[in-house]
Swiss-Prot record:
The organism's taxonomic lineage, starting at the top: Bacteria, Pseudomonadati, Pseudomonadota, Gammaproteobacteria, Enterobacterales
Location(s), subcellular: Cell inner membrane
Protein name: UPF0259 membrane protein YciC
Pfam families tied to this protein: UPF0259
Keyword Acetylation: no
Taxonomic source organism: Escherichia coli O1:K1 / APEC
NCBIfam families: PRK02868.1
Length: 247
């Protein structure tokens, strides 16, 4: 059967509209979890204020130079802040991926679904999803740090891994290998969707500071919710595409 991107886009749009409130609630809950965890594990305001003490920002040629000019205590605070942001983001993304994929599975099975039920049903697979998303993020970030393009290619090749891990109950590394093979064979269908997702995420990041006009916490929740909705659309598309490819 010939698969066209247009038909998958149409199916994705229909599902997103029909299940919008449930997906919105899952996105909002994941955003709230991300922000709360980030706040809990982040350094205090007093500690963060120390990062500006005695660091010659204007004379630093880059990030590594800036870090080298910090005291050991400031470097520890920066590391804690980065770790808190990364950890909370990974937790939120894992819950989002599990929740959205479970919504699709439950709706496809003709069952009634709510945001809490979807997240609860995804609980057994969250540890594997967390590891998968951590490894994927690590590989993509390393690729982007090199010359950008390898990172984008890795993001495309590993895009189907979360769907395969949940739908086919694969292991973490098995889903990554299978995703690379399957995506490579269907690059014309996967690449445009992932590139559009990356572009939308980048644009949202550029305008994220405007959300802080409310309060930093509310702005962070709103920005994360929009980011989660964008990711949810991609997950729906990838799930539908994967099911069509398997037929």
């Amino acid at each position: 059967m010939s698969i066209t991107a247009q038909s998958v886009y149409r199916d994705t749009g229909n599902f997103f509209r029909n299940q919008f409130m449930t997906i919105l609630l899952v996105s909002l809950l994941c955003a709230f979890i991300t922000v709360v965890l980030g706040h809990v594990f982040s350094p205090s305001d007093a500690q963060l204020a120390q990062l500006n003490d005695g660091v010659p920002v204007s004379g630093s040629s880059g990030l590594f130079d800036l870090v080298q000019n910090m005291s050991p205590e400031q470097q520890q605070i920066l590391l804690q802040a980065s770790a808190a942001s990364t950890f909370s983001g990974l937790i939120g993304n894992a819950i989002l991926a599990g929740g959205v994929i479970l919504i699709i599975q439950l709706v496809s099975a003709g069952q009634r679904v709510s945001a809490l039920r979807a997240i609860g049903a995804s609980a057994p697979i969250l540890p594997k999803l967390f590891i998968l998303i951590f490894l994927t993020t690590l590989l993509v970030q390393i690729g982007i740090m090199l010359v950008v393009v390898p990172g984008i290619i890795m993001a495309i090749l590993l895009a189907l891994a979360p769907v395969m891990l949940v739908q086919d109950k694969m292991g973490v590394f098995a889903s990554m290998r299978s995703s690379m093979r399957l995506t490579w064979a269907n690059m014309r269908l996967v690449a445009p969707a992932v590139l559009s997702w990356l572009l939308a995420k980048t644009l949202l990041l550029l305008f994220a500071s405007s959300f802080a006009a409310l309060t930093p916490e509310i702005g962070a929740v709103l920005a994360n919710t929009l980011s989660n909705l964008i990711s949810a659309v991609l997950l729906i598309y990838l799930f539908r595409l994967y099911m069509l490819i398997r037929q």
